[in-house]
Structures are given as C-alpha cells and as structure tokens.
Amino acid sequence: VMPSLHDKIYAHSPLPVQNWLISLYGLKLYRERYGPYYDKELKKLRRQRLVDPDAAQLNRLNRFLHFCQRHNRYYRNLFKRHNIELPLKHLEELQQIPVLEKETLRTNPDIFSDIKAPIIGSTGGTTGTALQVRFTVEDYQARMAHLDYFKEQHGFTKGMKRASFTDRMICPRDQEEPIYWRYNAPMKQMLYSVVHFHERTIPDYVDSLNTYRPDALDGSPSAMIEVAKYLKETDTRLTFKPIAIFPTSETLSPWGRALLTEIFQAPVYDQYASSEGAPLVTECKHGRMHLHPETGIIEPGENGEILVTSFTTHGTPLVRYRIGDRMTLSDETCPCGHSGTVISSIDGRQMNYVETPEGYKVFEGDLTATVAVLPNSVLQVQVLQHEVDQIEMLYVKDEERFEDEHETILKREVERLFTPNMRIRLKNVPAIKKEPNGKIRVVKRLHV
C-alpha cells in the first residue's frame, strides 16, 4: 500500500498505530485521487450525450498527440523521423506511428514529458518486466473518476464501505495476533492481507468481514474465492450482503465467478486496467466488457496481443504501446448503450503464486513488485520454487545500470515477503527461458 509499510517503524508499531499510519497514507492517496479534475471528469461522464463516437475519439487522439509533440522529446523526434503530420484526419492513420516497446519505455529517458507528473506507477506485469511510469494529478484523478463511475453504475458510490483484498505487506509476515487487516479511514476501506491467507486464518477473516459488513468487495479474486470456498464447505453464514464484487488484476474463471455470486449473493463486475496506465475496460450489467473510449484506444495486434494508446498518461505517454496482454475485440453492440468497443475476452492476467512452508501464498504481483525499489536496473525476473521451503529468483540485469549492491537490496525485498523458514537464492542469468507458447511464466512451482 505504501513504500514505508516495510519500514521497521511500521512493522514494530502497535496495531492501532499501524491503522493510524495506513489512514495517514490513505489521506495522501485521497487527496491525489479526488479533487477538481476528478469532479470535472465524473460530471462529464454522468451527463454523457450521444455524439459521433469516431469523431469524438479522433479529437481526443489529436489532442493527446499534439501534447506529445509539444512536451515530449521522444515523440517529437519520432514524429519528425517518420513524417507524422498532425492533426490526423482518420483514426486509421494512428497505425503510421511506430509501436512503443517495453524496452524503450524502460530505458529511454526522453519518454518522460517536460511537465509536472508527481505520481509514480510501477509494475512487474504479466511478463516480469519491471517498469516505472509517471502520471499527472489530472491523469490520476480522471482514471479514478472512470473507475468510480463504473462502480456507480452498479450501485456502489464513493463513501460506502469497502473490503479490499490486497497482496501488499500491510501486516508483518511473522505477526502472531490474528488480525490480518488494517483500516484506511479516509476511504472507508478495510484492507485484508492476502499474504496471510491460510486455512487456519480464513475463519478470522470471515469474523472480521461479518463485523465490518462492507457494501462491496474488491481486489484479489483468488482471495475472495478462498473465503467463498471456506463458507461453502463449513456452511458458515454471512451477516451482510454486498451490493457488488469488483475483482482486479487477475483473470476470473467462470467457476470462480459463479462461486462468488452464489456465496456472497452479489453480482460480480470485472475490470481491466494496468499500472502503466492502459485504457480502462469495465463490465456492464449485461456481462459485456467495454472500453472507456475517453481513456484511450486499443488496437488488435498479432496473435491477439494488443497495442494501447492511453489518453491518461501525459507524464509518460503511451502511444501504440505493446503492453503484453491479449484481448479479443468484438464488433457487437450492447443493450446497455455504452459506446465503447466490446472486448469479448481478456488474456494474460493469470496470477501464479509461491506457497510458503507455513501454507501461505505469496502472489506473483508481490514478487515482481520487489524490483520497483531499483532504478530500472533489472530487466526481467522469474521465481522458481524448487521445494516448499526453497525459491530461486532469476534476474536479468541491465549491464549499464546494475550495481553490485542491487542484488543485496533485491534479496532483502524478497525476504520481507517470507519468514526465515524460506531459503531464498538470487541468480543472475543472461535471459529468462520462454515457454512453448512464447510467453514467460513469472512464477514456476517445480516441486508440485
């Protein structure tokens, strides 16, 4: 949740102080996410009028490309080199602009715009490549307005109570007291630690949920499914009925969705976003996933691999960015009336995990996030679990940026996710081996 959560001060503070620190950080996030830009975008979404969607999208695209030309050296040079003349006259002309690869985003300092963009997003992604991007406050608030508008359409409004299942280290790994959650008061958000999930601890989570009685659940669907399985197997009753469930980050299987709907007696509405700032895709009441065209353009690429152009990435502009996820786009329309392109399937978001000797799960998102402490000096990582108490992190270093102490720093970050019972080894390799399908599996459990 916040960089300082791993600090010794936080880890050794009494629980009420940890809640206070979480809320303090929550206040910082609240001020970043909610403000004049958020209010403006949400009002615009609420009063949407019927317009020519292609013409509106071309206007948005040209505004964004003009910004890139004025404020971003990388794109200014790119447009000049490839004779890109603005404004574009048709949306199809976007294809004249070369594809932006992850390696360029990671290594080229010219990709950062010459404007104030104080909010940093970092990702390990589904490919294990570590990246840092920057957002303006306006970008951040516009994205938040779209996410809140999506939830609003399903009955959940800002200020209602949330239960969020997170793989961030909000509780010390070796905590003995069975309170694996912390409260973010400014956002009325109870944060539940996925890191501490275990068949022994799930009853504690259920008791907390029944006491807190949230209006909605969000975050890791894997964790919510574990709770649902426990409730079904033990015939335990909930004392609340959420308005909706909003899973994030992972691909939700049909059986997982059915189980959540059955046990929590609430509809499940999926969403797609990314730490890099990809255009938003959300699910409507008819079960279809729609692109929010105000946030960008998604182009189908080879083998379903998409290219994204995101209008909410002024700090680190993404134009025809190969994000590494796969989607199937559809020409169908939807009874809900949403003008955004229908996305019939999304692939590439499956989350794997390492299982600890104590029976906990450490998810791939947490493992890849460890490289974010380094200055883009690691190109890629892969975690191999050889035994229940032994993992090996393979990493590919950037020869120009990597320094000797970076391995020590990285190992320390990985160690924070486990108890001393886990033996951890780091190994520098020239490349990570791809699977037969051409993709890299970030986590491989070899002992099962």
Q: What do the PLM-derived regions correspond to, one by one?
A:
Residues V1-S122, T129-M144, D148-K161, R168, ...:
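Nucleotide 5′-phosphate-binding alpha/beta core
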Residues Q141, A163-A223:
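AMP-binding/adenylate-forming
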Residues K161-A163, L307:
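Conserved beta-strand elements of the Class I
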Residues Y180-W181, T234-R237, K285-H290:
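Short, hinge-like loop/turn segments at secondary-structure boundaries
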Residues M190-S193, Y269-Q271, I424-V429:
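General small-molecule cofactor/ligand-binding pocket signal
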Residues V195-F197, T201, P214-W255, D270-E276:
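Adenylate-forming
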Residues L217, V319-P420:
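AMP-binding/adenylate-forming catalytic core of the ANL superfamily
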Residues I243, P247, L252-C334, Q350-N352:
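Conserved AMP-binding/adenylate-forming
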